[in-house]
Amino acid sequence: EIRDLADVEVNFDGITYAKGASVLKQLVAYVGEEAFRDGLRAYFAEHKWGNTTLSDLTRHLEATSGRDLTSWVADWLETAGVNTLTPVLETDAEGTVTSAHIEQTAVEDWPTLRPHRIAVGAYELQDGALVRTDRWELDVAGERTELPQLVGRTRPALLLLNDDDLGYCKVRLDAV
């Protein structure tokens, strides 16, 4: 509960603002830039000079993106904690990926597994430098999200989850 400005100063710090910015960036990635922009235009046009609620905004974003944001709002705005994403790759003797997925975990005190829209980058060493050779976006949902894009390919030198920093999550590197 926030009773006065002193409570605001105690509850809103650099971490809060940074997380807020990251959650907004995640929302843009989740609904898509064009849908987000179109939703904001419709929202501002309908509510100019008026007061609004969060549901007014999400209604417009749902209409332009086609995504139901009810569970997204509950998971991202009404729960604490941060999820950890870990890539799990298996390869054969030649280094070809035979299976690949992302494991999502949460801490025991805040067990919510959130939906994430992230970019995944595959990197190779070229002339002594890491160079991104492939990138794709995908939705991470639940405990396990498959990465079929990697199966049948040579294991990359680096597989970077949340490449381009679209999501608010901890990222672990694979075991290699």
Predicted regions mapped to residue ranges:
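Non-catalytic accessory/interaction domains
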Residues: E1-R3, D13-I15, G20-D38, A45-V176
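Active-site flanking loop/helix segments enriched in acidic
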Residues: D7-V8
